[in-house]
Curated annotation (Swiss-Prot):
Disulfide bonds: none annotated. Belongs to the MnmG family. NCBIfam families: mnmG_gidA. FAD binds at G10, G11, G12, H13, A14, G15, V122, S177, Q366. This is tRNA uridine 5-carboxymethylaminomethyl modification enzyme MnmG. The gene is mnmG.
Length: 622
């Protein structure tokens, strides 16, 4: 009988990261997915990154994950979103060639040390004494294991809706999983329904681009991965068009036929990525909505019209599309649809992504209530790391709100849960100026090195970068000009007769890297790995970062105050019954987590701290 230490079920974005992370830690790992072309499948939009999402990708890369490197092998339209705003909200994004992305992912995974791939369907999991024992395939065969990571995406009791038509499926032309849903229910997990959707696909050869707006990418693509020196994939343009009043009229007239508005769908859809029906209803005063026409590949004429996700009947979809400028004569290749599926209340898992009910069972991705490739991948890498570390009897790996967007996401999910698809935003992070895309490796790679999940190649690149940062920082502190010389150059500084270094100049409003290079041409040679830009940001926002670091220190002190797993909150005096019940239900692991639970008062936190100091001499326990 086959046996693996870790088995990952599902080969989507969460699954591939989980499997690769487990394998990198030297643990024999099996990835089970339905078919080869499922590996890294982009079920919805052909793009990676975006605002906050791009930071997640960079953090995954910092831990030696796959997503950033793979998109650099397949990216055909790179664009830094929000670049006119502050660096805390910059969002690196890349349009992907679907075929190239899947090809690159397949080549990496099929040659990955310690990783085997099995193409098949898991029907059930075997559990004994609340511990994982094995997976059972639909052909009846059994594979033994110590840990299971469920990354099932939209496959748990998945149901596609196109108008009144219902199609049981986890994705188009792929059957759903009922067995795993039933098993999770029998175990006692709280399952609910969520919904997501996708727009129709259209033929780019039938679009009149003269009626659209050109959207070029960045002149020089900025890679996602620290392993990528330069993006060698050909770059192409995207285009923008809009809906019209006629489009809106057709949608309003047919709302009763929409699966979403007819009451046919139980699941709640993503608030921040609404269907076109939702947009027309919720934003009824808007005269138009933008649609981004995104090519799906270099040699693929399929266009993804980002912005018109819908569950309307096919004939209505055809009708409304032809009211959009440039799409009057377009050919629809595949209708849009909504899909609803089961997910587990993420409060059922710990911050390691292991379930609280079953030892050795980990959940990652949409099964935890999230939406988006990047959110799924971020969970996948953490689940894979922790499953492997548990096999090796090593301490778990836990990111926090203070050091990563991944940590923010996991803390949000495990503390608050979610009743709608959770999407990452910069606004969810209290420390977003410190948690930028450009410093992801400086925040996380060393943590990954400490547990052995980072390759030797990345270690060398990271070590070299850290050395270069110190050298360039020293240079910036050496190069200087007098205030009088700066004034002659038109740079406004206080005329105090002192010398101003480049780092001093970076703090001046409207002074930028380009000006520094113009004044000191030798700095042009230091632009490798964007180090100069990084140091510019650190200098420009130094005072804000100092204050934020103080806040982070306070946060970390509370996160370090552990709460015993078996603490009886009903024995703590001066806490109301309501709060005692809430704490008993949530079982917070630290004072910091307890403070973030809705409804927990500062007085209750004080009472817990005093009680712990009285009961436990060191104020903490496991």
């Amino acid at each position: 009988m086959l046996k693996y230490d870790v088995i990952v079920i599902g080969g989507g974005h969460a699954g591939v990261e989980a499997a690769a992370a487990s394998a990198r830690l030297g643990v024999p790992t099996l990835l089970i997915t339905l078919k080869p072309e499922n590996l890294g499948e982009m079920s919805c939009n052909p793009a990676i990154g975006g605002i906050a999402k791009g930071t997640l990708v960079k953090e995954i890369d910092a831990l030696d994950g796959l997503m950033g490197y793979v998109i650099d092998q397949a990216g055909i339209h790179y664009k830094m979103l929000n670049e006119t705003r502050g660096p805390a909200v910059w969002g690196p994004r890349a349009q992907a060639d679907r075929k190239l992305y899947k090809k690159a992912m397949y080549q990496i995974l099929t040659n990955y040390p310690n990783l085997d791939i099995l193409y098949g369907k898991v029907e059930d999991i075997e559990i004994k004494s609340s511990k994982i024992e094995a997976v059972i395939l639909n052909n009846g065969s059994k594979i033994l294991c110590q840990k299971i990571i469920l990354t099932t995406g939209t496959f748990l009791s998945g149901l596609i809706h196109i108008g009144q038509k219902k199609i049981p499926a986890g994705r188009v032309d792929e059957e759903p999983s009922y067995g795993l849903s039933n098993t999770l229910k029998q175990i006692g997990f709280k399952l609910a329904r969520l919904k997501t959707g996708t727009p129709p696909r259209i033929d780019g050869r039938t679009i009149d681009y003269s009626k659209t707006i050109l959207q070029p990418g960045d002149k020089i693509p900025r890679p996602f991965s620290e392993l990528t020196n330069i993006v060698n994939v050909s770059q192409i343009n995207c285009f923008i068009t809009t809906t019209t009043s006629e489009t809106h009229d057709i949608i309003r007239e047919n709302l009763d036929k929409s699966a979403m508005y007819s009451g046919q769908i139980e699941g709640i859809g993503p608030r921040y990525c609404p269907s076109i029906e939702d947009k027309i209803v919720r934003f009824s005063t808007k005269s138009e909505h933008r649609i981004f026409l995104e090519p799906e590949g270099l040699d693929d004429y399929t266009i993804y019209p980002n912005g018109i996700s819908t569950s309307l009947p096919e004939d209505v979809q055809h009708k409304l599309i032809k009211t959009i400028p440039g799409l009057e004569n377009v050919k629809v290749l595949r209708p849009g649809y909504a899909i609803e599926y089961d997910y587990v209340d993420p409060r059922e898992i710990s911050v390691t992504l292991e379930t609280k009910k079953i030892a050795g069972l980990y959940l990652a991705g949409q099964i935890n209530g999230t939406t988006g490739y990047e959110e799924a991948a971020g969970q996948g890498i953490i689940a894979g790391i922790n499953a492997a570390l548990a096999v090796k009897d090593q301490a778990p790996f836990m990111l926090t709100r203070a050091n990563s967007y991944i940590g923010v996401m996991i803390d949000d999910l495990t503390t608050f849960g979610t009743i709608e698809p959770y999407r990452m935003f910069t606004s969810r992070s209290e420390y977003r100026l410190s948690l930028r895309a450009d410093n992801s490796d400086l925040r996380l790679t060393e943590l990954g090195m400490n547990i052995g999940v980072v390759s030797e190649k990345r270690k060398k690149i990271f070590t070299k970068k850290c050395e270069d940062i110190e050298k360039i920082k020293s240079l910036l502190n050496t190069l200087s000009l007098t205030t009088s010389k700066l004034a002659k150059m038109g740079i406004q500084v206080a005329q105090d007769g002192t010398y101003k270094t480049v780092l001093d100049l970076f703090k001046i409003p409207n002074f930028n890297v380009e000006q520094a290079i113009k004044i000191f041409p030798m700095l042009k040679e230091t632009q490798n790995n964007n180090i100069l830009q990084l140091l510019y940001i650190e200098a420009k926002y130094a005072s804000y970062l100092t204050r934020q670091h103080a806040d982070i220190n306070l946060f970390q002190s509370e996160e370090a105050q552990f709460i015993p797993k078996n603490l009886d909150y009903f024995k703590i005096p001066s806490i109301s019954l309501e709060i005692q019940e809430k704490l008993s239900s949530h079982k917070p692991t630290t004072i910091g987590v307890a403070r973030r639970i809705p409804g927990i008062t500062p007085a209750a936190i004080t009472a817990i701290i005093i009680y712990l100091k009285t009961k436990y001499s060191d104020g903490s326990s496991t």
